[in-house]
Amino acid sequence: MKVRIDKAALTVPLYRAQGVISRKPMNNVLAHVHIAASEDGLVFTAAEYDVTVVAEVAADVIEPGAAVVNGRSLFDIVRALPDGATVQLSTEANNRLRIEAGRAYYYLNGMAPEEFPPNAIEDTQGRGLLCDKSHLETMLKRTLFSVSQEENRPALNGVLLEIEPEGNGAPANQVRIRMVSTDGTRLSKAERSMTVSDYDGQKHAWILHHRGASELQRIFEGADPSARIEFVGRNVVISSDKARVQVRQIEERFPDYTRVIPERGDASVTLTTSEFMSAVRRVSSLASSRGDSPLRVELEAGRMVLEMSHNDGEAHEEIDLPDYQGAKIKVGFNPRFLLDVCNVLGTEHITLELSDQFSPCLLHADEEPGCVFVIMPMRM
């Protein structure tokens, strides 16, 4: 194999592979990236048990061939090269890869290409659709943060992806796409109605493993405005901007999220998001790293009171609510959960709906009607 390619172009597929490449792999080959050169250009493949990433890039291919080398080492070398550099990759004896740029050269010891797992992404198209990438990117941002990290609860280790016809007399290519995640103490739901193409008209529901869902963010950074979602066997393949991510489906039953989301709270207040976030940050500066100290949120006529106590002291802050004349309510929350919602929602205002110290809090914003968040209270 012998190819020449601009440094900037080479950096893109290597960057997209980084999240999949294992730092401490049980199988050494999973720390490597497979490079295939043909007359069509370069194809980079990185794989682990739940995710496979394939990224393509145009290149001047002098001699076709393949190489398998440590993906992080190659990425570190390439990104450190001067901007505008032309990089030459060539294979030598004993599976070594030579990297040249100007008067500099590097060698990486590799593996035989046949030792790399066969490409797990099937070339045949499955059932799916083509849609606006920006919608998927936004929904993913607003749900991925609340995925459970506890491996003993596999159904919660991913993002539920639902696709269904819009119905109600809408055109056949009008669908509703929904993403939901929960860790058992909080829940996030984001949905959008959008016009798509190549839709099969069927309802689909899959749980995307969180590692694969995270990798989608890398390919969504590309310039291509569209993304294709395909359902192939037990996997979901999402393609955009000359890159494909295959995510393993978690074959578990996702909880019935509709039973968790309250319709309304007994009390509803709308706040300026930046003001609320700043107050929560200041008051929660006394919070322990274990997150076992609740932020006490109290509503009473004309104001919201935020309080927190810790061994080192206590904090008290008030926010004026001139329009609130409802009942007095006091609830405890993990302050980080409140801040997480404010961060991912990113709207000018946020609405909190509360009932009592034992009931979940509903958070949403008029600017984003398709997004709702639920936070369970903490014992005070």
What residue ranges belong to the model's regions?
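Structural preference for solvent-exposed beta-strand-turn elements
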Residues: 1-380
